[in-house]
Each structure stands twice: as structure tokens, then as C-alpha cells.
Design a protein with these regions (language model features):
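Compositionally biased linear targeting/interaction segments
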Residues: 2-318
Length: 318
């Protein structure tokens, strides 16, 4: 074998090795790409599965809450028709008001209650609050004013709310804000000049930064909201359509009860809440008589009730 032949074969082996390495590199790249693509697709499918599962868990919560409210309404109607009570009643001792605790307890007893998912569910009585859409009415304004004074929320913010829900372009003194103010913002938008659709609109109104951060101390025995168990402004104000509801005195938080009259103090509210827990007020007249007979306060505002019409369902599936 000549040296020329050996050199050619060595060169051929070198070329074959290079081709092999290139093919291996291509195959490795393809395998990595296919593996990554498969992993991504699996993750997408798993995320879709989990999202779909969470959605149906949340939907189940909504249906459960509606069934509980329907059952409560029908029981009230039956009691009224049988003369057991003179009018419908909704209070904090009923199942709908404690549904969050009942659902949590049920999931603790039955780990697979929602097919491996978890449900956080509660029903919030919107009639326990003050309808902020009625702030410009003579009977509602003083109640909102006392709520704001108690938490040291500025008068300017109260005026800005009045301008937000009224139907004119005249600014309320002091501190009111109409479309001219909002259109000069970095991200302009018009003033609503009409009833709020949701209470979250409070965060669109001039002066909201400080006001919506304010908290109200919960009275003894109240749950409050959030980690610290205090009430926020959105816990005390609602935004409901039309004329709006009456305030349910059987479910209203302490700060709302105290805002009903300028002479109601903290101790009186605490006593009323304790008595209400033991024996909810059967009629509005009973609530008025309670404050008149016990504390000499006779001129409570109109638009009070002992039952509720508007509820909000919060259902979160995981």
C-alpha cells in the first residue's frame, strides 16, 4: 500500500467522522427541540386543564351560593305565609352569612369534595352597606358624611363622589371634580355623571389614593375584612342600581349603625350588636324602639329594613 493510498483513506475517515458528528449534532438539536416542544405542550395542556378545573370549581360555588340564597328566601316566604314572622328577615346567624366557614369545614372533612380542587366562597350582603349612589339625597348624605368624618376622609373626596354620581357638570364645593378635571389627567377619562355600576369606581375618583386606604375598626364580635379584620370604605359603601336598597339593620356593620345618627356612640353600637346577635330585630319598628327605649334616640333615618335584596357572590376555584 502506497503512502498516497493511506493518506486518501485517512482523509475519507476524517470526512466520515465529521459527517457523523454533524449528523449527531443535528439529531441532538432535533431531540432537544422536540423534547422542549413536548414539555411546553404538556405544560400548556396542564395549565388549560387546571384553569378549566378551577373555572368549574368556581362555577360550582356560584351555583351553591344561589341555591343557599334561594332556600333562605323560600323559607322566609313560608314563615311569613304561616304567620311565624311578620316580614322577611336576613341576619348574620343564617347559613348564607357563614357559607365560607361551612364550605371550608366541608372541604376539611372531604378532601376530594371538588375533584382535587379547592373552593373559597362567600356571600356578601350589599344591603348592609350605604348606597353611595344616593349620596346626593337628603336622607343619605348625613350618613355618608358621618362615615367620612369618623375615618378622617377629606371633605374634598366626598364632594368628588357627589360630582361623580350626579348628572350635571357643576363642581361641588369644596374639592369637587367634573369632566374638566379628569380630562386633564395623564390618562384622561370622563366623569361618570351618573350612578356607579360597581363600588370599585371609588378608585377612579379624585382623591381616592388616601381615602380608599382608610380603615375602620371592627366592633367586638365582627369579622371585619382583610388580614387585620378591619373594615374598608368598600365594606361600608355599595353601588346598586335604581332607587337602591334599604339598609338592613340586622347585618349592617358597626360603623354603619353608628353613622345612622349623630348621637349614637361606640358603646351603644356595641350593645346593639350583641343584642342583635342573640335576637335579630324582627321588624324595623323593633330596631327604632330599641334605640328610643334604651338610648333616647328617636329620629333614626328612613330607608331601613330587616331583610336584604342585593347580595354579591365571591367564588374562587383553585
Amino acid at each position: 500500500m502506497t503512502g498516497k493510498t493511506r493518506g486518501r483513506r485517512s482523509s475519507e475517515r476524517g470526512i466520515a467522522l465529521i459527517i457523523t458528528l454533524v449528523l449527531v449534532a443535528i439529531l441532538v438539536t432535533l431531540v432537544v427541540e422536540v423534547t422542549y416542544s413536548t414539555h411546553v405542550n404538556v405544560r400548556i395542556a396542564a395549565t388549560f386543564r387546571d384553569d378549566l378545573s378551577a373555572y368549574y370549581v368556581a362555577r360550582s360555588g356560584v351555583e351553591l351560593a344561589l341555591a343557599v340564597l334561594r332556600m333562605d328566601f323560600e323559607e322566609d316566604q313560608e314563615d311569613v305565609s304561616q304567620g311565624k314572622q311578620s316580614t322577611r328577615q336576613d341576619h348574620l346567624g343564617e347559613l348564607w352569612a357563614n357559607l365560607d366557614e361551612a364550605v371550608t369545614a366541608a372541604q376539611g372533612l372531604e378532601a376530594d369534595l371538588f375533584g382535587g380542587g379547592q373552593l373559597f366562597l362567600r356571600i356578601i350582603d350589599e344591603d348592609r352597606k350605604i348606597n353611595v349612589n344616593l349620596i346626593n339625597q337628603q336622607s343619605t348624605y348625613p350618613i355618608v358624611e358621618r362615615i367620612f368624618l369618623d375615618s378622617e376622609i377629606s371633605e374634598d373626596y366626598r364632594s368628588a363622589i357627589m360630582d361623580w354620581v350626579d348628572e350635571n357638570q357643576e363642581e361641588t364645593d369644596p374639592g369637587g371634580a367634573e369632566t374638566r378635571f379628569y380630562e386633564n389627567l395623564d390618562n384622561p377619562y370622563p366623569c361618570k355623571d351618573g350612578p356607579m355600576d360597581t363600588i370599585s369606581e371609588l378608585r377612579m375618583i379624585s382623591g381616592h389614593d388616601e381615602a380608599t386606604k382608610k380603615t375602620f375598626e371592627a366592633f367586638e364580635g365582627e369579622k371585619g375584612s382583610g388580614d387585620k379584620g378591619k373594615w374598608t370604605l368598600e365594606d361600608l359603601l355599595s353601588a346598586v342600581p335604581g332607587r337602591g336598597p334599604n339598609i338592613n339593620v340586622n347585618t349592617a356593620p358597626g360603623p354603619v349603625i353608628m353613622a345612622l345618627h349623630q348621637d349614637i356612640d361606640h358603646l351603644q353600637v356595641q350593645e346593639a350588636l350583641q343584642d342583635r346577635t342573640a335576637d335579630p330585630f324582627p321588624r324595623v319598628d323593633a330596631f327604632r324602639d330599641y334605640f328610643n327605649n334604651n338610648f333616647g334616640i328617636a329620629d333614626l333615618p328612613p330607608h331601613l329594613a330587616v331583610h336584604s335584596e342585593y347580595f354579591r357572590i365571591e367564588s374562587v376555584g383553585i
